[in-house]
Amino acid sequence: ILSLSLLDRSTRCKGTGKSCSRIAYNCCTGSCRSGKCG
């Protein structure tokens, strides 16, 4: 089971260093719905 606390707070995408919300957890893989990712 993944720790929700890790996804709960904003996480920096690997490589990009941009912050993403838990909803945009897939931002690091290229998928981002909400939050600043690119």
UniProtKB/Swiss-Prot annotation:
Tissues/organs with expression: Expressed by the venom duct.
Site annotation Important for calcium channel binding: residues: Y25
Domain comment in the entry: The presence of a 'disulfide through disulfide knot' structurally defines this protein as a knottin. The cysteine framework is VI/VII (C-C-CC-C-C).
UniProt GO MF annotations: calcium channel regulator activity; ion channel inhibitor activity; toxin activity
Alphabetical UniProt keywords: Amidation, Calcium channel impairing toxin, Disulfide bond, Ion channel impairing toxin, Knottin, Neurotoxin, Presynaptic neurotoxin, Secreted, Toxin, Voltage-gated calcium channel impairing toxin
Disulfide cross-links: C13-C28, C20-C32, C27-C37
SUPFAM superfamilies recorded: omega toxin-like
Positions carrying Cysteine amide: C37
Name by which UniProt lists this protein: Conotoxin FVIA
Propeptide stretches in the record: 1-12
Record lineage: Eukaryota, Metazoa, Spiralia, Lophotrochozoa, Mollusca
Coiled-coil annotated residue ranges, if any: none
Family: Belongs to the conotoxin O1 superfamily.
Matches recorded under InterPro entries: Conotoxin_omega-typ_CS
Miscellaneous comment in the UniProt entry for this protein: Negative results: has no significant effect against all Cav subtypes tested, except for Cav2.2, as well as against TTX-sensitive sodium channels of mouse DRG neuron.
Chief subcellular location: secreted
Its biological purpose: Omega-conotoxins act at presynaptic membranes, they bind and block voltage-gated calcium channels (Cav). This peptide reversibly and selectively inhibits Cav2.2/CACNA1B (IC(50)=11.5 nM) voltage-gated calcium channels. Channel time recovery after toxin exposure is short (about 50 seconds). In vivo, it effectively and dose-dependently reduces nociceptive behavior in the formalin test and in neuropathic pain models, and reduces mechanical and thermal allodynia in the tail nerve injury rat model.
GO cellular component: extracellular region; host cell presynaptic membrane
Keyword Disulfide bond appears in the UniProt entry: yes
Compartments reported by the entry: Secreted
